[in-house]
């Protein structure tokens, strides 16, 4: 499916809307991912579940920045799922396994927040989530820089 057709489907379903987001705002969102990653790392020694949740939040923020750089904003319906779908479409098969992990973490995070009795996040899970988040944030930063090589981002 072409990118235009894919994006139009999401717009028609009211899951996405065109919106120009300033590069300065995108840079701030990316900078927030760095804080999220640091917090997730520190939380490992305190609470695995919250570390996992914060690592996922870093991925979500990076994914949102990626959607913003494309000129769109997720609407109020299914924002997290939409961000995963948009990043999957544009990053393609090269990062398929990482995007699948992002989606898996999205589902686990949902259970952790809304039905915590259904999930037990281990130290191994939390460390794996942090590693995936670090990798994902780096990829998104590289993609944003690649799309705007003329900008000297400070992230």
Q: Predicted regions span which residues?
A:
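Terminal alpha-helical segments
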Residues: 1-155
